[in-house]
């Protein structure tokens, strides 16, 4: 299976399955001399891990990360960093009934078509369990970006179902189980989740991720545009069906006189572009949004077929998230951090000596 690696200079390769012995990743390209401990990675892993609230899957995984290599006496050595998380709460028997059945809306059918077989236990490699390693690797990138460049990356839920959420107060995001920046909507979200659990159904969501303090000049002009790489990274997250940069699809209704981000001696007057112009960062906040579909792992009966082509009725058993968008927030932060760190290292490698007299704000 190819496609397990992201990045050029900062490279992250993950491995493992939902019900395997462990998950792991190799992180290449981390500069030497950076203070790094397992505790630095654990905070974001705890934000993502299952079983932390009644609104997410009740699979209880401690997600304790182990640093296997690349760190000596508390600092990075510049060599490959190996990370490992053991799986401890698998219930593979929950999936025995779907051994020969394709769950509608899942990767069961496509994996079988591609490989001729599949690991049916929790989706195997296609499970969002894999994203734990992305979060661990992303925590390294977030630490480097914050300490070396003052870059802050934050994410939040900005819509669940038909409930829009305004970014009113970033300080509230970590104070509720929804990563919600709009405290006035917490009760509505709680009511929706209770209804979904009662119905055995699920709902989609929108997640917004913002990077502040990103210097101008990151990104390449054509195929490796910064926004293209961000979109690629976010689209690689399980259940993501759409990505927007800045105003995204809303620009369709704007005129050029409205959409252009005018510049004065005091800086940009707007940020419809989401901090990226011509595939290169402008120095403004980088803003991206991603839409996540409602999970198909629900107890509402649905039609499908088995491996023998016979039509059957499907009811998903096991422990699942009614809204996968909730735990996707730290994953989105991690993927944005991975892309930004990769492009910072690439910019430093090629253009470290470039000096301009153009104002920067």
UniProtKB/Swiss-Prot annotation:
Report the transmembrane regions from the record: none
Q: Has the keyword Nucleotide-binding been applied to this entry?
A: no
What GO molecular function terms would the record report?
chorismate synthase activity; FMN binding
Question: Pfam families, alphabetically?
Answer: Chorismate_synt (PF01264)
Q: Which domain of life does the UniProt lineage start with?
A: Bacteria
Q: Which UniProt keywords apply?
A: Amino-acid biosynthesis, Aromatic amino acid biosynthesis, FAD, Flavoprotein, FMN, Lyase, NADP
Q: Which InterPro entries match?
A: Chorismate_synth, Chorismate_synth_AroC_sf, Chorismate_synthase_CS
Listed under catalytic activity are:
5-O-(1-carboxyvinyl)-3-phosphoshikimate = chorismate + phosphate
Residues reported in the UniProt entry to bind FMN: 125-127, 238-239, 278, 293-297, 319
Cofactor(s) recorded for this entry are: FMNH2
Q: Where does NADP(+) bind?
A: 48, 54
**What note does UniProt attach to the cofactor annotation?**
Reduced FMN (FMNH(2)).
What PROSITE patterns does the record point to? CHORISMATE_SYNTHASE_1, CHORISMATE_SYNTHASE_2, CHORISMATE_SYNTHASE_3
GO terms under cellular component: cytosol
Q: In which pathway does it act?
A: Metabolic intermediate biosynthesis; chorismate biosynthesis; chorismate from D-erythrose 4-phosphate and phosphoenolpyruvate: step 7/7
Q: Which GO terms describe its biological process?
A: amino acid biosynthetic process; aromatic amino acid family biosynthetic process; chorismate biosynthetic process
Query: Which NCBIfam families is this protein grouped with?
Result: aroC, PRK05382.1
The protein's job, in short, is: This reaction introduces a second double bond into the aromatic ring system.
Q: Which family does it belong to?
A: Belongs to the chorismate synthase family.
Q: Which HAMAP family does the record cross-reference, listed alphabetically?
A: Chorismate_synth
Q: Which PANTHER family match?
A: CHORISMATE SYNTHASE (PTHR21085:SF0)
Q: What is this protein called?
A: Chorismate synthase
This protein's species is Escherichia coli O139:H28 (strain E24377A / ETEC)
**Gene behind this chain?**
aroC
